[in-house]
Amino acid sequence: RGARAAYLERCLAELCGAEAAMVVNNCAAALVLNLRHFTAKKTEVIVSRGELVQIGGGFRLSEILESSGAKLREIGATNHTTLDDYARAIGPQTGLLLKVHRSNFFMEGFVAAPERRELAALAKKKRVPFVEDLGSGVLLPAGDWAEGHHEPMPREVLKEGADIVCFSGDKLMGGPQSGIIAGKARHVQALKKHPFFRALRCDKLVLSALQSTAERYLHNQAGTLPLQRMLTADLASIQRRTRKVAKALKGMPAKICVTPGHSQVGGGALPQVPLPTVTLDIVPDDIRLNDFAARLRRATPPVIGAISGRRFRLDLRTILPDQEKPLMNAIRQSFISK
């Protein structure tokens, strides 16, 4: 029987600078599979209190860890964890040293945590597997579009000594929902042989879409992905397009203007990096804002915006140029239909 994801796995390994890679249906599944494998005999997993994050939908890392059957060993304080905290916690029942990237929040002030290389050296010395969960992983330098900001990439995590890295194939990678596991070949092969892996496998449609995404990165064509086009959109271009749409809608029974604003990246990532943008602001003359927003949601195609400051707002960063005409038609129709 052929391995349905063999070519994709080689592509992902190349992108991550890893010996091997594999795919499951989301990043939480990737973490659970690692936990079930590495804590099967030695049940404790060590993690800093400052990294016990809550992800979308109200799911908490601590609850995910416990649901896998692992025993959570919290160390350090919320804002301060040292290498000695990790060293003292490692014992005969330690199955895994886990580092979790705080991708959806940040701390500043009196904050400290050991460097990744230090954790990797400690894990190697103590012969404990070291896994890092990046959450919404990014494959290209975030500084290209978020000036002055660094977001850890799978390649650097592995280069600095982690045995395994997990991250999402959607979110900042821009592919379909999936979880990617990359790292040392012996660990990846063991994870693929774990009985629980079959319950987490992706279907062929997801694998195909992820393959297309990975190939664009490998062929230096990531800029053609919708997500990358949105992240790297030039402010001047957004302003020009927004003004063009505002001008085309002149005559509608509403106050329409272009206002400076910020785009939130979303996807559980980069909460402190709003991207400069402008918004198309609409205040209908004779329709309540909530009713106008509801009409747009029912339009063809549906249009989803935000109500803020007593205005209905659209950020054209997230609307591709070839979607501008359908957008304007939907807005015009929403002033007529009920």
Q: Over which residues does each language-model region extend?
A:
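Glycine-rich phosphate/diphosphate-binding loops and the adjacent beta-loop-alpha structural elements
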Residues: 172, 232, 312
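Short, glycine- and charge-enriched coil/turn segments that flank and shape catalytic ligand pockets
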Residues: 125-126, 220, 250-254, 285-287, ...
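A common structural junction motif
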Residues: 198-199, 297-304, 332-338
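Conserved C-terminal alpha-helix-loop-beta "cap" of PLP-dependent enzymes
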Residues: 239-322, 326-327
